[in-house]
Amino acid sequence: MVSQVLTVCTANICRSPVAEAVLRAGLPGLTVRSAGLYALVGRGIDPEIAETARAQGIALHDHAARQFDDTIGREADVIIVMETHHRQDIGQRWPQFLGKTFLLGHFDNARQIPDPYKQTAGMQHHSVELIAQCSRTWIHQLEQMTR
């Protein structure tokens, strides 16, 4: 049974906190957290991404970036990453977690979520939109798993 979900990106200041917020809102019975493989520990969500997410109706919470590690990985029942290289990195560094690590776009044709950090407003909007879309698909799938 799934009770804890972890979203992971590179720095934990853009994609994974937005996915965390969408999943948390849609799955109130689950614990949803986020982390970064190369986290900018303690930093909040990038202000431009936060503004873009809020404009799309995503309610963000207070956030401080945290580093993915063995303990965080062990606590999660499902680890959701943004790009294939994140999954590969986890598999190389923590092979014990590879079997529970999936792309956010897993159910959307294995779609990759491009890194919006310091990109154009259009790219940021597109990335946040993809995160919301793929997160909604995960919400549906996780609801089926927890019944």
How would you name each of these model-derived features?
Residues M1-R74, H140-R147:
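Conserved active-site segments centered on acidic
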Residues T7, I80-V81:
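Hydrophobic beta-strand core positions in alpha/beta domains
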Residues A53, I79-I80:
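Hydrophobic packing within well-folded, soluble alpha/beta domains
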Residues V78, T84-R147:
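Phosphate-binding/catalytic loops
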